[in-house]
Amino acid sequence: MNRRQWLYGAGFLAGAGQFGSSSAAPPAQKNVSQPKPMDLTQYEPKSVLQVHESQMEQSKFPLIDFHTHISFSAKSEHGVELAPERQYLGTPEELLAVMERKNIRAMVNVTGGYDKGLAEAVGKYDRAHPGRFYTFTEPSYSRFKEADYPKVQAQAIDQAHHDGARGLKILKTLGLYLRESITSGTLVKIDDSRFDPMWDACGQLNLPVAIHVSDPIAFFTPTDRFNERYEELNNHPDWSFHGGDFPSNDELIAARNRVMARHPKTQFVALHVGNFAENLQNVSENLDRFPNMFVDIAARIGELGRQPTTSRKFFEKYQDRILFGTDATPHGDEFPQQVFNDKLYEIYFRFLETEDEYFDYAPAKIPPQGRWRIYGINLSDTILRKVYYGNSARLLQI
């Protein structure tokens, strides 16, 4: 019995109780079409909620996007970069056009590579357009098996600094992909002592370390009907780290924390809100514990925006240690939450600057990370200036 049938039955029985027995039949029902099952990928509900929609053509203040991917390795295997050569996702002219429209003072290309690839990227962007682009270097994992790798990698950081690198980027390769034989064998832990000289070199040269460890907590749980990011993982099954020999999210975060504790003179930017935007209490505890820790918000406004009250308090308390970043990738249409275009930046501005309610966190028909919407946190001008520009400028020494 469906709800409509139950209501008809309840009314009929009530009448029978009041007036005695009756032979009257229940009112005839109109033919009601039953919804047909559909594939979840076809489901694109449109909200009927009538709320204010702010139009955000530019950020209120100039900004530095601390987290973008303008280039990537030309050769990789099993998640590990194996060659210094780079492939580029956008020309300086293409990027600058968007930057001018959106009030972006500078972009940081965190995946600038190493050796000749780094030198080429710095020349192509940083030196050709001073003050608009800043490039980070990356570890040369292809030499990891060499006996003197710790020394070689520390020297590579010094050379990268000489070549113009403004920081070091650690992809989740370390902890989730790099193995003792580079692409095979036991996983190498984030706090492996062989990397200590590299962390120290960054501290001595005042190069910030942009470190990505772990991933959304849903990626470490079964991809089943209870997983709120089921569609995302179904589309990208290789993003799941549940099972196998992968460490847990807690183990990865703990290993990163041990690195920060061992190297207090090195500044670490724990990307993606410390890779734990689902638990701002945990991120807050780590920020309180490690004065050399910062965070960016790249690709996590979907998490921050569904807890607006908690997020606003988080920004207010840690306003000097939060960096604006998007994880933007030119021509990366497969991942709408990080595609480099005007619309992406407008959503970030709306989240940070307004009190708008229930809006999309990515320019996509179907929310790419989970089926929810977000709310703006309306930060003060003082905090916006720091998050948009001041905090990144201080770390980059510009």
Q: What is the predicted function of each stretch?
A:
Residues 34-47, 89, 244, 249-258, ...:
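H/E-rich (His + Asp/Glu) clusters that bind or coordinate divalent metals
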Residues 56-57, 96-101, 120-132, 156-164, ...:
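Acidic (Asp/Glu)-rich catalytic clusters
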Residues 72-75, 84-90, 110-119, 142-151, ...:
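Acidic-and-aromatic substrate-binding clefts and catalytic sites of carbohydrate-active enzymes
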Residues 6-7, 26-128, 391:
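An N-terminally biased module of ancient metal coordination in phosphate/nucleic-acid-related enzymes
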Residues 67, 99, 202, 295, ...:
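Conserved, mostly hydrophobic/aromatic
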Residues 64-68, 107-109, 135-137, 168, ...:
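Hydrophobic faces of well-ordered beta-strands that scaffold small-molecule active sites
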